[in-house]
Amino acid sequence: MAVVVVLLAIALIVVNVADIRIRRPAAGPEAPAETTLPQFPFGDEPELILGSGETPARDAEQVVPVDGEDKTMQLVTGSFAQRGGPDFSLYLDKGVFLSTELDGKCCFARADDASMDAYLEIGYHMGADAQTLAGSLLNDYGTIASMETLGEVKLGGLTAYGAKGVTVQRELEAYLIPTANGCISVVLCHAGTAPASWYDSLLASAQTLQITG
């Protein structure tokens, strides 16, 4: 009888131990290992051109003459600081034209102009000579049937080196503005099928361009 009691006691102890192990709270989740985010080299950093840079001392809106008619345009700002370039600003009819960034350049075109029949593009070229680049820049915009360099010209209050070119479908104008470490390019493009008022408005915007820094 004593042996039976001892065996029952041992069995009870084993059951209790097993029960304790089963009911023991599970360990909390392991803390995630600390990860180091990859650091992009300078050339691979996502660019932010539009809306960046120092805020210029210019009004938020300005009346701009467009082909003899006054238009109220809104201030657009940007900076090419990530490319070693200056800040810039200009006035644009934001109710008609959209502002976008592509391949390190800013493009202004109508929302309903899917074919890009008229647009204004502003870019920065680190280390480039404005006068030299004026002779070749338009080759980046298609097969140029004919081209003419204009020498030193004015774009609003800025001095630039100009060029004009023609492709099968479009006419192009380029203005290369010297800066401290390179030059800024301003390119106007318009197709013969696009209303002249589109080009006139974009040219008026380009003539309000200011560069700082």
Functional labels for PLM-detected ranges:
Residues M1, I20-F80, G84:
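N-terminal, intrinsically disordered, polar/charged segments of Gram-positive cell-envelope systems
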Residues M1-P46, A163, E173-L176, S185-L188, ...:
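Gram-positive cell-envelope targeting signals
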Residues Q74-F80, G104-C106, K154-K164:
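Short, hydrophobic/aromatic-rich segments at coil-to-beta transitions
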Residues T77-T132:
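Secretory pathway targeting signatures of secreted, lumenal, and periplasmic proteins
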Residues K94-G95, D112-S115, G156-L158, I177-I184:
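Short, solvent-exposed coil/turn segments at beta-strand boundaries
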Residues G127-D129, T167-R170, H190-P195:
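Solvent-exposed loop/turn segments at secondary-structure junctions
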Residues L138-N181:
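Signature of long, low-cysteine stretches enriched in small and polar/charged residues
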Residues C183-G213:
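Surface-exposed amphipathic alpha-helical segments
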